[in-house]
């Protein structure tokens, strides 16, 4: 079966995006892994699938699959690409699009200069809803990871995140700590591991080891999680620039009970066809 797709990225976090509104396509985990292979397939961090709305109050349903074939609840960089894709492909003429995901609903707004703002919803700190094994909600948790003890914050942005504040991001062994945190027993559904260096109350540096994908050039939901945790711990103000290896995102959050907003760029790389 031949399918049409687009290759897109948000700050180097790259995606294969497929319109399943006008195409009838089923992706098995094995097929996704083949397509994600950077030597034998298309190559991507995540596959994004555009489906007809499940809910009459939304415009589309948004599905996300990691390179290992697992389906996940959320992808912030992908959401920005999703908004640009449906407009670019003529699936909508709206500049503000409502979508449902495995985690809930989101509002995506096309801005000028290929920027998209995403209402990421209200950060969730209740351990059972992340999910994270803890007796009660804390701003900071102590965890044993391998031979080390870390101090971290946990939050769900529709998907689970663990954020550790570090003194120097360049000296942080993300390749070792990332997978240990991702598969830590206190996270029954695994977790995205973020490592944040606070530059000022309005700027941080961040690296993210993503669940099922490894370290990526950028992680939108990870940037949101880092700011939410940093704000809750009293380290950050309401508006923060998050510098990732792939570029910058701008996050705005007014505190608990409020929706968090992410703004960042989108790039369309190419369109293609492939036999599935």
From Swiss-Prot:
Key words of the record: Amino-acid biosynthesis, Cytoplasm, Isomerase, Lysine biosynthesis
GO cellular component, one term: cytosol
Binding of substrate, residues: 13, 46, 66, 76-77, 159, 192, 210-211, 220-221
Active-site residue numbers: 75, 219
Site (Could be important to modulate the pK values of the two catalytic cysteine residues) residue list: 161, 210
Endpoints of the signal sequence: none
Gene3D superfamilies the record matches: Diaminopimelate Epimerase, Chain A, domain 1
InterPro entries: DAP_epimerase_AS, DAP_epimerase_DapF
One GO biological process term: lysine biosynthetic process via diaminopimelate
EC number(s) reported in the record: 5.1.1.7
Site features described as Important for dimerization, chain residue numbers: 270
GO molecular function: diaminopimelate epimerase activity
Pathway: Amino-acid biosynthesis; L-lysine biosynthesis via DAP pathway; DL-2,6-diaminopimelate from LL-2,6-diaminopimelate: step 1/1
Localisation: Cytoplasm
Family of the protein in this entry: Belongs to the diaminopimelate epimerase family.
Job of this protein: Catalyzes the stereoinversion of LL-2,6-diaminopimelate (L,L-DAP) to meso-diaminopimelate (meso-DAP), a precursor of L-lysine and an essential component of the bacterial peptidoglycan.
Protein name (Swiss-Prot/TrEMBL): Diaminopimelate epimerase
Source organism per UniProt: Photobacterium profundum (strain SS9)
């Amino acid at each position: 079966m031949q399918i049409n797709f687009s290759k897109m990225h948000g700050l180097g976090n790259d995606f294969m995006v497929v319109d399943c509104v006008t195409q009838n396509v089923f992706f098995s985990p094995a097929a996704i892994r083949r397509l994600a292979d950077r030597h034998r397939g298309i190559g991507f961090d995540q596959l994004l699938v555009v489906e007809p709305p499940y809910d009459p109050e939304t415009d589309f349903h948004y599905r996300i699959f990691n390179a290992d074939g697992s389906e996940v609840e959320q992808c912030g960089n992908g959401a920005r690409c999703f908004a640009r894709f449906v407009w670019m492909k003529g699936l909508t003429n709206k500049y503000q699009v409502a979508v449902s995901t495995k985690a809930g609903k989101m509002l995506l707004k096309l801005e000028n200069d290929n920027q998209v703002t995403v209402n990421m919803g209200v950060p969730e700190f209740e351990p059972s809803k992340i999910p994270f094994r803890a007796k009660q909600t804390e701003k900071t948790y102590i965890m044993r990871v391998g031979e080390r003890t870390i101090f971290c914050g946990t939050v769900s942005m529709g998907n689970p995140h663990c954020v550790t504040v570090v003194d120097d991001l360049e000296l942080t062994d993300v390749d070792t700590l990332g997978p240990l945190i991702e598969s830590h027993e206190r996270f029954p559904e695994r977790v995205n591991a973020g490592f944040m260096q606070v530059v000022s109350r309005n700027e941080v540096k961040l690296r993210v080891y993503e669940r099922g994908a490894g370290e990526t050039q950028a992680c939108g939901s990870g940037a949101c999680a880092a700011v939410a945790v940093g704000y809750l711990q009293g380290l950050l103000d309401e508006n923060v620039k998050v510098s990732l290896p792939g570029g910058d995102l701008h996050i705005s959050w007014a505190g608990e009970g409020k929706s968090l907003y992410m703004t960042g760029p989108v790039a369309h790389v190419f369109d293609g066809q492939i036999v599935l």
